[in-house]
């Protein structure tokens, strides 16, 4: 694995977010959203990829990978830090993608340094005693980092019991003002459903869900939010409004009306985000913010999600804005080039 370690160290020095090792291909990395090669890197053989992966897996994980042909897990490499890993079979052999994780959870102030409005709204949401906050976006948009930043703020401000359910655990939270228990699906508990059901009996104040993936997880999250818990969950969606539809589509049609009522009652807000390249060479998040105002709650209850857009467009003073308004604000501040904003705006 020594070659892997050398490459991972080089990737971190160049600010890479992801590293790719694949049979029959040279190693690659993603820097500021762009895929690029390592200097003078040679093609990986099947044996090299297999040996490196084998060194990272526990005996239990090897059995899992042998049976399912793919696996998600997280590791900590001495002197290099933590990585989220996905390994899979492909037509040419093995592929391994490593996401570089920070040594400690990100600070909300850092993630929202260019966006005072998003910072204020997220802090307000974190101070709620109960309800549901959704972190939405496409893969690789940074929603897990924003969720972790909010958990860290809760952990550092006040005495609350936080239970996380993750697959895998990405950021490690040390109990500070309160108490944090992190559970990894497949390692500490069999499934999201089982972990969420158990969490309701473990006297939490805050329940953090890596992703709402199925009917039962959605139902349990809504139940938890309705019964006095603050629930922070992620979902994959194309915008904040689409998050509402995606969440409800996970529930069987016969139960959807009831779930819609629970969501309308318990929702605090939805933050949708995307990452853009900055003028200075890094990346910055653009945050779309949907607040569960009385008007928004009524539109959810009445199954009129598309009418929520007009409420967002006119609700800036109430802590709401669309992704297009967020993109324009970054361009106006000179943080992101206007041509870049135009390209991203077409995608949303």
What are these regions (language model features)?
Residues 1-348:
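Short, flexible helix-loop junctions that flank or precede catalytic/ligand sites
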């Amino acid at each position: 694995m020594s070659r892997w370690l050398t490459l991972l160290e080089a990737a971190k020095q160049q600010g890479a977010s992801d590293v790719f090792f694949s049979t029959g291909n040279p190693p690659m990395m993603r820097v500021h959203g762009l895929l690029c090669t390592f200097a003078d890197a040679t093609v990986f053989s099947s044996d090299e990829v297999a040996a490196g992966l084998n060194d990272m897996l526990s005996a239990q994980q090897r059995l899992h990978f042998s049976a399912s042909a793919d696996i998600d897990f997280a590791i900590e490499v001495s002197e290099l830090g933590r990585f989220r890993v996905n390994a899979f079979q492909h037509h040419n052999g093995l592929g391994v993608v490593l996401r570089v994780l920070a040594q400690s959870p990100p600070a909300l102030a850092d993630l929202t340094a260019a966006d005072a409005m998003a910072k204020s709204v997220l802090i307000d949401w974190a101070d709620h005693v109960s309800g549901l906050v959704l972190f939405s976006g496409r893969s690789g948009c940074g929603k897990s980092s924003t969720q972790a930043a909010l958990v860290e703020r809760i952990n550092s401000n006040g005495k609350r019991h936080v239970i996380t359910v993750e697959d895998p655990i990405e950021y490690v939270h040390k109990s500070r003002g309160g108490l944090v228990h992190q559970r990894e699906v497949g390692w500490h508990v069999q499934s999201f459903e089982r972990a969420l059901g158990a969490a309701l009996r473990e006297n939490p104040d805050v329940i953090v869900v890596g992703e709402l993936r199925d009917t039962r997880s959605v139902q349990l999250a809504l139940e938890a939010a309705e019964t006095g818990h603050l629930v922070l969950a992620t979902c994959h969606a194309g915008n904040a409004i689409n998050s509402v539809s995606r969440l409800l589509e996970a529930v069987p049609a016969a139960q959807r009306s009831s779930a819609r009522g629970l969501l309308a009652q318990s929702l605090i807000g939805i933050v949708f985000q995307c990452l853009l390249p900055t003028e200075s060479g890094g990346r910055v998040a653009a945050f779309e913010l949907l607040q569960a105002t009385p008007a928004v709650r009524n539109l959810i209850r009445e199954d009129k999600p598309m009418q929520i857009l007009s409420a967002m467009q006119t609700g800036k003073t109430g802590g709401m804005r669309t992704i297009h308004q967020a993109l324009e604000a970054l361009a106006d501040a000179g943080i992101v080039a206007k041509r870049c904003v135009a390209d991203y705006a077409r995608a949303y």
